[in-house]
């Protein structure tokens, strides 16, 4: 779980929105790219680090928070009297073929009253809500097929009082699909080949560790880093014919799915 220390002080109204977009490295109207949070195009988070505002990618946020940095630029004014503020940042990792972005997740603040409504679309740039009632609260989100929550920062639940500023960081990752290929060989006409003598290839999707591998009677399970239409084929082996291929040997595979292909060859 991500932890944040210190108090995030935020600006009000249009100034706040503009500052959040600027501090997170986004331009007005731009849609953050789905990705793994690394490299070119990643959305960056503003942190107050030793009195200086810096911007880092999401993978580095956790380490900075452990060392006492806080999310948000340095030196921002406090909330208005009699209110608190809660900022929700939604980060989405799509490194297994997913295409969802933060806006595809519906966020809800429970237990307290937020101006403008307690439910809103997620945003990598962050959505800041003025809180007008206080006490126990939690931040939840609607489930999105193919994605799982991987972390929620400490301020995604707890209690909030007048004058406080809190930041909730929710991170979801797309679930990799898996494909298991079982190779069966029947030798009832004098053949001596084993499953390992058959070279298997998965086509149409990207397989972590390589798309081609030796057959196995126990099954070879591979994780996919892309999804969609696929087929499983094998190299021809003299003296053997493909007797059957199960339904899982071709079709489409989606995020989080697990499919099994059984290929059976017989000596002729």
Report the location of each language-model feature:
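Bacterial N-terminal signal peptides that target proteins for export
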Residues: 1-14
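N-terminal secretory signal sequences
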Residues: 2-4, 52, 126
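Intrinsically disordered, low-complexity Ser/Thr/Pro-rich tracts
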Residues: 3, 77-82
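A general structural signal for well-ordered secondary-structure junctions
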Residues: 7, 70-71, 147
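Solvent-exposed loop/turn and edge beta-strand elements of beta-rich ligand-binding domains
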Residues: 18, 22, 80-268
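Sec/Tat signal peptide C-region and signal peptidase I cleavage site
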Residues: 26-29
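Soluble extracellular-acting proteins and domains
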Residues: 31-77
């Amino acid at each position: 779980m991500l932890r944040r220390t210190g108090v995030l002080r935020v600006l009000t109204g249009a100034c706040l929105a503009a500052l959040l977009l600027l501090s997170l490295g986004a331009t007005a109207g731009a849609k953050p790219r789905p990705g793994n949070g690394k490299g070119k195009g990643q959305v960056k988070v503003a942190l107050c680090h030793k009195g200086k505002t810096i911007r880092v990618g999401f993978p580095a946020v956790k380490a900075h928070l452990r060392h006492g940095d806080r999310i948000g630029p340095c030196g921002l004014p406090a909330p208005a009297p009699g209110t608190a503020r809660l900022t929700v940042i939604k980060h989405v990792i799509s490194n297994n073929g997913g295409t969802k972005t933060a806006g595809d997740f519906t966020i809800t603040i429970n237990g307290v009253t937020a101006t403008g409504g307690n439910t809103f679309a997620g945003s990598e740039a962050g959505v800041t809500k003025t809180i007008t009632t206080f006490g126990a609260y939690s931040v939840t989100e609607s489930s999105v097929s193919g994605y799982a929550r991987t972390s929620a920062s400490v301020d995604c639940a707890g209690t909030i009082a007048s004058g406080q500023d809190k930041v909730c960081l929710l991170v979801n990752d797309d679930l990799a699909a898996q494909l298991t290929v079982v190779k069966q060989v029947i030798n009832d006409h004098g053949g001596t080949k084993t499953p390992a003598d058959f070279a298997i290839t998965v086509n149409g999707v990207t397989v972590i560790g390589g798309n081609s591998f030796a057959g196995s009677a126990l099954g070879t399970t591979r994780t996919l880093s892309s999804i969609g239409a696929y087929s499983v084929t094998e190299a021809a082996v003299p003296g053997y014919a493909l007797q059957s291929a199960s339904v899982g040997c071709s079709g489409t595979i989606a995020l989080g799915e697990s499919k099994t292909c059984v290929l059976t060859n017989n000596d002729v």
